[in-house]
A protein has these predicted regions:
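N-terminal helix-cap/turn-to-beta initiation motif at the start of protein domains
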Residues: 20-34, 58, 85, 132-134
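Acidic, glycine-rich flexible loop segments
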Residues: 102-132
Length: 166
């Protein structure tokens, strides 16, 4: 085998294996989900109990998650995540905040996607938060968002939702 062919095989197959790994992982997040948790409408607000229902579909290296979370009569909000894996790197978008659609960028470690949420610039500075989307055992998923408190800079959990596959 020539050095060029060897180099090509080494370059292609690890990437193909990474895509296959991400496809298998994304399949664990596919399905109809329901659950509950707590959400803060902003980092300084008190947490509200919510119930959520989500529909998640994996298609190869892509994941679409759409649904809604409700806090009794206080609010109901549609939420959605669109992600695409490129090797071990993930990019996409998140909707569900009053700030508008945000960009998502991150990687996977084990059964957890670690994503940066980059909110749109609304005339001030762009704000960055984080989202962890985790496959927690068979038929369980957890979504956690964390962002800095605007006055103190302290990291605040703004959402923690535990979901079970229907």
């Amino acid at each position: 085998m020539t050095p060029a062919i060897t180099a090509l095989l080494l370059a292609v197959f690890p990437f193909s294996a990474a895509i296959a790994d991400e496809t298998v992982f994304l399949d664990t997040l596919s399905g109809n989900w329901h659950g509950s948790g707590q959400v803060r409408l902003n980092p300084g607000a008190v947490p509200l109990a919510v119930s959520c229902s989500l529909d998640s579909r994996a298609d190869g290296a892509a994941l679409n998650l759409a649904g809604a979370c409700r806090a009794k009569v206080v609010f109901s909000r549609r939420i959605g995540v669109d992600l695409r894996a490129n090797g071990t790197r993930y990019t996409g978008s998140y909707v569900g905040s009053r700030r508008g659609a945000a960009r998502l960028v991150g990687t996977r470690t084990g059964a957890t996607l670690n994503l940066q949420i980059i909110w749109p610039d609304k005339g001030t500075s762009s704000r960055v938060a984080s989202m962890r989307l985790a496959s927690v055992g068979t038929g369980h998923m957890q979504i956690v968002t964390i962002e800095p408190h605007p006055q103190t800079g302290e990291q605040v959990i703004t959402a923690k939702i535990e979901l079970t596959r229907n």
